[in-house]
UniProtKB/Swiss-Prot annotation:
Active site, UniProt feature: S25 (schiff-base intermediate with substrate), Y58 (proton donor)
Keyword Ribonucleoprotein recorded: no
Protein name stated in the entry: Aspartate 1-decarboxylase
Gene Ontology MF: a single term: aspartate 1-decarboxylase activity
Organism ancestry: Bacteria, Pseudomonadati, Pseudomonadota, Gammaproteobacteria, Candidatus Pseudothioglobaceae
Gene3D superfamilies cross-referenced by the UniProt entry: 2.40.40.20
Function comment: Catalyzes the pyruvoyl-dependent decarboxylation of aspartate to produce beta-alanine.
């Protein structure tokens, strides 16, 4: 049997932009994507700490060390600049894979600069 578990989390990132007229997605600083091992165009869940909104979208790789967290398209209605978000990715694992499973938890400062990785 396969089960779905958290594979990575970007904890308490700050929204730097919202782009309603963009096709969709969430642009994320490339350094943060690499730290979390989240790929470009990978499905993510976003949890807005400020207003409780939760939604699904996908990633676009932003410029490294830019601090960018831009929520785009229809999802831009669910977020304001300055909102604090949790961005999560999930994976499907076999029982064997779960024996060595550890999620990557990434923490940032108030400028979205990586400060800590726990795994």
């Amino acid at each position: 049997m396969k089960r779905t578990f958290l594979s990575a989390k970007l904890h308490k990132v700050i929204t730097t932009a919202v782009e309603l007229d963009y096709e969709g997605s969430c642009e994320i600083d490339g350094v943060l994507l690499d730290a979390a091992d989240i790929g470009a165009f990978e499905q993510i869940q976003i949890y807005n700490i400020n207003n409780g909104n939760r939604f699904t979208t996908y990633t676009i790789r932003g410029k490294d060390n830019s601090g960018v967290i831009s929520v785009n398209g229809a999802a831009a209605h669910k977020v304001n600049v300055g909102d604090m978000l949790i961005i999560a990715a999930y994976g499907v694992y076999s029982e064997k894979e779960l024996e060595s499973y550890t999620p990557r938890l990434c923490y940032v400062n108030d400028q979205n600069i990586l400060t800590k990785i726990s795994s």
